[in-house]
Curated annotation (Swiss-Prot):
Keyword vocabulary terms for this entry: Cell inner membrane, Cell membrane, Ion transport, Membrane, Symport, Transmembrane, Transmembrane helix, Transport
Function: H(+)-stimulated, divalent metal cation uptake system.
One Gene Ontology molecular-function label: symporter activity
Stored NCBIfam families: nramp (TIGR01197), Nramp_1 (NF037982), PRK00701.1 (NF001923)
Recorded name of the encoding gene: mntH
One of the Pfam families matching this protein, by short name: Nramp
BP GO annotations: iron ion transmembrane transport
Protein family per UniProt: Belongs to the NRAMP family.
Annotated membrane topology: Multi-pass membrane protein
Entry's localization field: Cell inner membrane
Lineage top rank: taxon: Bacteria
Listed name of the protein: Divalent metal cation transporter MntH
Length: 413
């Protein structure tokens, strides 16, 4: 009887530790459903129906492994990826890494900020510039939560992630995708033409986020409670749950676009405004409004995550710190420039996702090297299988980027 009570008590304690350690992956996962995903997935679904769903599936599985490795690095070493690169690489390489990581973070933030501004424009009927001002104010307010510690921010961002997921459950109900072709698109790889390759690279860039690779290792490096092994096991659950939700949202985005647009003859839907306007007569005003609200939620939460990632990158690589509000103010500027110049915001969103795909390998190569180093990682070092899969992911990413560059230069369609 006594031993049974002890076992129950230890089991409850283990569950408490696991729950206490949940959260960082939800912050990371919000980066996987930013407005760049909306733009890329809608364009892919409208243009090719369900044919590119398999890209989302495989990209999400890759992202799960990558986020586990990133989180594991922080747990095992007490340092984030940027700090490890700074400590182990020559100074010119470190500066190169810092510059490209900042560019990637700014490209990400551009997509996220403009996406939220478009959401405000669609739902409230304001101008895009007014939507950008509302986005700026809202992100400043969310970032103020950081003063109270990491947990309150994790809860707010996790709540926004769940809101977007529920919104897309509703969108799927409205759009009623056909199950047979949807299932075929999930399991049978196909790239019909050059545009499909471009969009596949965009989906990859939108699904595997370089700035979040840096951020996740920072979110776990100061975790306390339980043993190192318990922290790692809790983190794996954290990643599995959060990334499954993010993966579902991405699949739902593309499937909804395919069902609502592609199979109703609207294959040219290529921007978020057009998607909103087309959804209303095809499905309902409620479906269009839910789309707009989910875009706002995704944009606000992901732009906050982008700001945090930029801070981690700067502090980690060059040991330089600026206040979060100042970084937020600086990184808003490109978005306002794009809006004031009247550039196509959705095209900017899709292009930013393609740019992101070029930063994946640069973040992933050192991550694999460090997490495969037994001296650094101890008992959490990568197994041979994980190393093999990791390098295969690098090869896939580099090959897709190479194909994209060659196709662009030669004008292949």
């Amino acid at each position: 009887m006594t031993s049974s009570r002890v076992e129950n008590s230890s089991s409850r304690a283990a569950r408490k530790v696991k729950l206490a350690l949940m959260g960082p992956a939800f912050v990371a996962a919000i980066g996987y459903i930013d407005p760049g995903n909306f733009a890329t997935n809608i364009q892919a679904g409208a243009s090719f129906g369900y044919q590119l769903l398999w890209v989302v599936v495989w990209a999400n599985l890759m992202a799960m492994l990558i986020q586990v490795l990133s989180a594991k690095l922080g747990i095992a070493t007490g340092k984030n990826l940027a700090e490890q690169i700074r400590d182990h690489y020559p100074r010119p390489v470190v500066w190169f890494y810092w510059v490209q990581a900042e560019i990637i973070a700014m490209a990400t933030d551009l997509a996220e900020f403009i996406g939220a501004a478009i959401g405000f424009k669609l739902v409230l009927g304001v101008s895009l510039l007014q939507g950008a001002v509302l986005t700026g104010v809202a992100t400043f307010l969310i970032l103020m939560l950081q003063r109270r510690g990491q947990k309150p921010l994790e809860k707010v961002i996790g709540g926004l992630l769940l809101f977007v997921a529920v919104a897309y459950v509703v969108e799927l109900i409205f759009s009623q995708p056909a199950l047979a072709p949807l299932t075929k698109g999930l399991v049978i790889p196909t790239l019909p033409n050059g545009e499909a390759v471009f969009l596949a690279a965009g989906v990859l860039g939108a699904t595997i986020m370089p700035h979040v690779i840096y951020l996740h290792s920072s979110l776990t490096q100061h975790l306390h409670g339980g043993t190192r092994k318990e922290r790692y096991n809790a983190t794996r659950w954290d990643v599995a749950i959060a990334m499954t939700i993010a993966g579902f949202v991405n699949l739902a985005m593309m499937a909804t676009a395919a069902a609502a647009f592609h199979f109703n003859g609207h294959t040219g839907v290529a921007d978020l405004d057009q998607a909103y306007m087309t959804l209303e007569p095809l499905l309902s005003h409620a479906a269009a409004t839910i789309f707009g609200l989910s875009l706002i939620a995704a944009g606000l939460s992901s732009t906050v995550v982008g700001t945090l990632a930029g801070q981690v990158v700067m502090q980690g690589f060059i040991r330089f710190h600026i206040p979060l509000w100042f970084r937020r103010a600086i990184t808003m500027l490109p978005s306002f420039v794009v809006i004031l110049l009247g550039l196509d915001p959705t095209r900017i969103l899709v292009m930013s996702q393609v740019l992101l795909s070029f930063g994946i390998a640069l973040a992933l190569v050192p991550l694999l090297i460090f997490t495969s180093n037994a001296k650094l990682m101890g008992d959490l070092v990568n197994t041979r299988w994980v190393r093999g899969i990791g390098w295969a992911i690098v090869a896939i990413v580099v090959s897709l980027n190479g194909w994209l560059i060659v196709g662009s230069l030669l004008g292949v369609d």
